[in-house]
Amino acid sequence: DLDPAVITGQTALATSPADTDEFLISDAGVLKRLDASLIGGGAHVLLATTNVTSGVSQVDFTSGIDSTYKNYMISFTDVHPATDSVQLQMRISISSTFKTDTSYIYGGIGRESDAGVISFSDSTGSGFKLNHNLGNASNESSSGNVILHNPSGTTFSKMFQADATGISAGGRGNKTIVGGFYNSTSAVDGVRFYMSSGNIDLGTFKLYGIN
């Protein structure tokens, strides 16, 4: 008989299992061991986290975006601006230099809770706009996700898409969807988030690789 302590475990594993760690499985009633490397992970692999707890001018991810994954996602949660009626924006980095030229091309649509239509676009932007007119009242913030498509590729322009929800200046709820590209085929190696005016006061930003 197998000692139950072998199954229940004597010591907790405090970190992710190594590829050579093993599990016991029942294969048609026969116990077999299985390497952790053969067990598929989740679709999203957390690579980095930045928690903003006081005012900063920007949040940068300058490592972790490379050819390891085809696509990357950045989630932002409870992002609160210092200034009223501003937008969260994003720039990309090429060869460790954040681009501030007018090669950001995008369009977005959305709705506000008063049935107002949101529409914005730019063919000569200096950054991607990710949401709509955030309020800075104590209960107002924005959350959403940005997808970078094949940032390490060098054949096509650098595509992105984003969706966000938030509370506008004036207390209206809103939802926006935006997509576009940076007009260069060079590999992207970083991203920067910043407000159209003023600081980011609070928020959590997470970078994921997408399997």
Language-model features: where?
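Surface-exposed molecular-recognition determinants
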Residues: 3-11, 19-31, 35-211
